[in-house]
Amino acid sequence: MKILKPYMRNTSISCYLCFLLNSHFLTEAGIHVFILGCVSVGLPKTEANWIDVRYDLEKIESLIQSIHIDTTLYTDSDFHPSCKVTAMNCFLLELQVILHEYSNMTLNETVRNVLYLANSTLSSNKNVAESGCKECEELEEKTFTEFLQSFIRIVQMFINTS
C-alpha cells in the first residue's frame, strides 16, 4: 500500500532553478529567488490528491463486493456546493467507523489512505466556517454502498473545482 507524498512531485524544478541562478547567487535578489524556489518544493500539491481519493474509493467499492458490510452511516446525499467542506468532514468522520468496525486488512489500508490523502488536501480548508450546513448527526443514515456513491460524488465536485 502506498501513501502518496504530493509535496515531493516537483523536485526537479529546484535543480533547474539552481542552474539558472548559479551565476546570480551573489545578488540579494538571486538569493531570495533561490530560497523561495526551495520553499515552493515543499508546498503541498493538491491537484492530484482528489483523483487519488476517488481511485481509492472505487477500490473500496470493488472490495465490498466480497466483504459483507452491514452498517449504516450518516450520508449527505444532497449536499450544497457551498457546504462541500462541511460535508467532506462528515464523510471522513464516518469513514473512520469502518476502521473500528471491520478488520479486513486491505479495506483498512485503503480507508487509511483515503483519510490521509483527503485530510492532507483539506488541511487548508479544515477551519472554514460554512453557514447553513447540516451537522453530521442531522444527516440521513444510509447503507455503506450509498455512502460510497455520495462520497465519490463530493470528491468529484472537489476535482471539478480544483
From Swiss-Prot:
Statement: the UniProt record of this protein carries the keyword Disulfide bond: yes
Glycosylation site list: N104, N108, N119
Induction: By type I interferons, double-stranded RNA, or lipopolysaccharides.
Disulphide bond pairs: C83-C133, C90-C136
Alphabetized GO MF terms: cytokine activity; cytokine receptor binding
InterPro entries: 4_helix_cytokine-like_core, IL-15, IL-15/IL-21_fam, IL-15_mml
Domain of life of the native organism: Eukaryota
Signal sequence range: 1-29
Entry's localization field: Secreted
Biological process, per Gene Ontology: cell maturation; extrathymic T cell selection; immune response; interleukin-15-mediated signaling pathway; lymph node development; macrophage differentiation; natural killer cell differentiation; natural killer cell proliferation
Keywords: Cytokine, Disulfide bond, Glycoprotein, Secreted, Signal
A GO cellular component annotation in the UniProt record: extracellular space
One Pfam entry name: IL15
Residue span(s) of the pro-peptide: 30-48
Function per UniProt: Cytokine that plays a major role in the development of inflammatory and protective immune responses to microbial invaders and parasites by modulating immune cells of both the innate and adaptive immune systems. Stimulates the proliferation and activation of natural killer cells, T-cells and B-cells and promotes the secretion of several cytokines. In monocytes, induces the production of IL8 and monocyte chemotactic protein 1/CCL2, two chemokines that attract neutrophils and monocytes respectively to sites of infection.
Family assignment from sequence similarity: Belongs to the IL-15/IL-21 family.
Name of the protein this chain belongs to: Interleukin-15
Lineage: Eukaryota, Metazoa, Chordata, Craniata, Vertebrata
